[in-house]
Amino acid sequence: MELKQEMASLLKTSPNAVKKRLLHQIGLSLYNTSHGFHEEEVKKKLEQFPGGSIDLQKENSGIGILTLNNPSKMNAFSGVMMLQLLEKVIELENWTEGKGLIIRGAKNTFSSGSDLNAVKALGTPEDGMAVCMFMQNTLTRFMRLPLISVALVQGRALGGGAEVTTACDFRLMTTESEIRFVHKEMGIIPSWGGATRLVEIIGGRQALKVLSGALKLDSEKALNIGMVDDILPSSDETECLKEAQEWLQQFIKGPPEVIRALKKSVSSCKELCLEEALQRERDILGTVWGGPANLEAVARKGKFNK
């Protein structure tokens, strides 16, 4: 009886309503006032720490280039950059033509994490937890973007910078780059969700080694433990970006609505229990089944096998 009612409800649900519901789910945050998190108060505190910028360029290819731009401080996140990252994530949530995203640092290095000026000023446990919740909210929304994302690690990704790479679907390094979770050396643990995501990427045992040893992961070591997906041949900033775009193209060929639906489906499987993940997969299927790309593919009569 319950199954019949659910099916009846599903049949009455319009595709537009399903799309609206899925878009709302993408933008959901982990924390709100019920968790003691007051976003506007945190924003006011972060505004006090200027410097750098988060720059977004949208390519006609459907690839977005997100650049952490604070080179005088190894692209460390100022308070303003944390706020701008959230703004860019919200913009990307609404970029319906987008299929892929590359996040990188300016001037051939990725990021050294948090700007120490902000860290020193926000020194109480309450401040630390507030910024933690803000960045976990932002990076979870980043992770849920319906775009296939790649962290292009040129130079060093340290501390919070290393955590940001874990919010991406894939990670690419050059022969000269390094990833290091230095949190232990700072007397803390990862606070932007990096430990949780790292366990998912490389498993609990390897994650414990990486975190407790504050290990320096060069490209070969990172590749061996499954932290990164490939090593790019060039270390030149411009050439390396081109190589990353070419690498990403193999996964985003096809109509945006199909690529985005695939990413949404995988994101659901990672976060939900089996029953909920299957239901979400059903909902996402309803946004592409019978659509232009599906009908065109069916009309080709299996030519994709050749």
From Swiss-Prot:
<dbReference type="GO" id="GO:0005829">
    <property type="term" value="C:cytosol"/>
</dbReference>
<dbReference type="Pfam" id="PF00378">
    <property type="entry name" value="ECH_1"/>
</dbReference>
<protein>
    <recommendedName>
        <fullName>Ethylmalonyl-CoA decarboxylase</fullName>
        <ecNumber>4.1.1.94</ecNumber>
    </recommendedName>
</protein>
<dbReference type="InterPro" id="IPR001753">
    <property type="entry name" value="Enoyl-CoA_hydra/iso"/>
</dbReference>
<feature type="modified residue" description="N6-succinyllysine; alternate">
    <location>
        <position position="216"/>
    </location>
</feature>
<dbReference type="GO" id="GO:0016831">
    <property type="term" value="F:carboxy-lyase activity"/>
</dbReference>
<keyword id="KW-0007">Acetylation</keyword>
<dbReference type="GO" id="GO:0004492">
    <property type="term" value="F:methyl/ethyl malonyl-CoA decarboxylase activity"/>
</dbReference>
<comment type="function">
    <text>Decarboxylates ethylmalonyl-CoA, a potentially toxic metabolite, to form butyryl-CoA, suggesting it might be involved in metabolite proofreading. Acts preferentially on (S)-ethylmalonyl-CoA but also has some activity on the (R)-isomer. Also has methylmalonyl-CoA decarboxylase activity at lower level.</text>
</comment>
<comment type="similarity">
    <text>Belongs to the enoyl-CoA hydratase/isomerase family.</text>
</comment>
<keyword id="KW-0456">Lyase</keyword>
<keyword id="KW-0963">Cytoplasm</keyword>
<dbReference type="InterPro" id="IPR018376">
    <property type="entry name" value="Enoyl-CoA_hyd/isom_CS"/>
</dbReference>
<feature type="modified residue" description="N6-acetyllysine; alternate">
    <location>
        <position position="216"/>
    </location>
</feature>
<dbReference type="InterPro" id="IPR029045">
    <property type="entry name" value="ClpP/crotonase-like_dom_sf"/>
</dbReference>
<dbReference type="GO" id="GO:0006635">
    <property type="term" value="P:fatty acid beta-oxidation"/>
</dbReference>
